[in-house]
Design a protein with these regions (language model features):
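The feature marks non-catalytic terminal segments
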Residues: 341-392
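Generic beta-strand/beta-sheet core signal
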Residues: 9, 164-166, 209-211, 244-247, ...
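A short alpha-helix-loop-beta-strand transition element characteristic
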Residues: 334-342
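A conserved beta-strand->alpha-helix junction
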Residues: 229-255, 343-346
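Conserved G/P- and acidic residue-centered "switch" motifs that form tight phosphate/ATP-binding loops
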Residues: 189
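General small-molecule cofactor/ligand-binding pocket signal
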Residues: 144, 242-244, 315
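Active-site adenylate/phosphate-handling loop in enzymes that bind or generate adenylated species
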Residues: 129-134, 167-179, 246, 250-251, ...
Length: 392
């Protein structure tokens, strides 16, 4: 019986110094939590590699492998097989385990690595030996050390030897939660889910905040954003989305403020509310999907005016990206199809005909001074709805 196993290679974590252990602990916590939703597995970490083994016949290794490709902090994910550290047994395992790969390929080579230096063969000798055995077992697959279709990987480690084909790229980045907490403004568009994904990839646990303007925006629009957040849990892990009632604020802005400043004042309210939610949850930053010059409210002057109301750093991972680059990532992470569903969001409500694109901060402050800002912010925060989400 083949000893099926998944090998996970750490990414940036291996470059860490004294705090590396805390990053590894966060990674292991995230991996085990993801595996718990699938079945029973044994997961442990040795020499910068995480090992996942099935506990019994009900352990779904295919599902576990797929889930691990979405865990931040991993450079590669390898479906492998293990055996004792004996050259003949390693060759026999390779012949058996890689049968389909060898039959499909026209050429191959072997690469061996030994972290256990007590193994009696050098890495080159082991690769040559196993390669010879594979060539004899599969004579139609030629040896090509320069440009092979298939590379057979052999790893001799402290506990056992492992054989696998080409590794699957991991999600990269750093373990979610290793670099603190931030709130992320999540609309129903293409950009904000991508910005959320990109900051999560840097090890940040995220609290999505959505501004809901019923009846100007529909219940379907809210459910669309909740679905986007649920899709993001594949990468971000469990999240609680904060749905903020925004109708009264927008109506007050429309009734009392200069139309040219509607969008700017609305965005400033969003930042104030995001700051309140961040403070209540220990978050240290606000994430937005803004992209320089994409729309009228995303000029440098407009963004400076918007960000002036918060003390927290505002993270804008999309700031220099082209729209097509953003769409490519949205398709990759599975949010694009939901993002383009035809439901409006609060940013389309009461849109000014001639928005200010180069506002002066003093002008914006004067325009919004007719509002009871603190009362409106407190009312919105008190009325927010929390929806807990996890990957299903």
């Amino acid at each position: 019986m083949i000893n099926d196993i998944i090998l996970l290679k750490q990414g940036e974590i291996v470059l860490k110094g004294l705090n590396r252990r805390s990053f590894e602990q966060k990674l292991m916590s995230n991996i085990k939590r993801r595996l718990e939703a699938i079945g029973k597995f044994k997961a442990y970490c040795l020499q910068s590699t995480v090992y996942i083994e099935p506990v019994d016949e009900t352990s779904d290794m295919d599902a576990a492998f797929e889930a691990m490709t979405k865990v931040f902090g991993l450079a590669s994910v390898n479906r492998a097989a293990g055996c004792e550290k004996d050259a003949k047994k390693i060759a026999e395992l390779a012949i058996d385990y890689l049968r389909e790969d060898m039959l499909a390929a026209k050429s191959f080579k072997c690469e061996a690595k030994r972290s256990d230096k007590s193994f009696p063969m050098t890495s080159i000798e082991l690769a040559q030996f196993v390669g010879g055995e594979l060539s004899e077992a599969y004579p139609d697959c030629e040896v090509d050390v320069h440009d092979p279709e298939l590379t057979v990987h052999i790893e001799v480690r402290d506990l056992a030897a492992y054989v696998h084909a080409a590794p699957t790229p991991g999600a990269g980045g750093m373990p979610v939660g290793a670099n603190g907490v931030a709130v992320t403004l999540l609309s129903g568009g293409i950009d904000s889910p991508v910005s959320t994904y990109m900051i999560a990839k840097r090890g940040v646990r995220l609290i999505p905040v959505h501004f809901f303007s019923f009846p100007y925006t529909s219940e379907q629009a809210k459910q669309k954003v909740i679905e986007l957040a649920r899709e993001l849990t594949v990468y971000c892990g469990r999240m609680t989305i904060e749905v903020v009632p925004f109708t009264h604020i927008q109506e007050e802005i429309r009734a009392k403020c200069d139309e040219d400043y509607f969008t700017l004042i609305m965005r400033r309210f969003m930042m104030r509310i995001a700051q309140k939610i961040a403070d209540a949850n220990g978050a240290k930053a606000i994430v937005t999907g803004e992209n320089l010059g994409q729309v009228a409210s995303q000029t440098m002057e407009a963004m400076a005016s918007t960000q002036a109301v918060t003390e927290l750093p505002v993270l804008q991972p999309l700031i220099g990206m082209d729209k097509e680059e953003i769409i490519t990532i949205a398709r990759k992470i599975g949010t694009f199809d939901t993002s383009i569903l035809p439901y409006e969001d609060c940013c389309t409500v009461f849109t000014p005909k001639h928005p200010r694109t180069r506002p002066k901060l003093s002008e914006v402050e004067r325009a919004e001074s007719v509002l009871d800002i603190d009362a409106l912010v407190d009312e919105a925060v008190k009325g927010l709805e929390e929806v807990e989400l996890r990957h299903e």
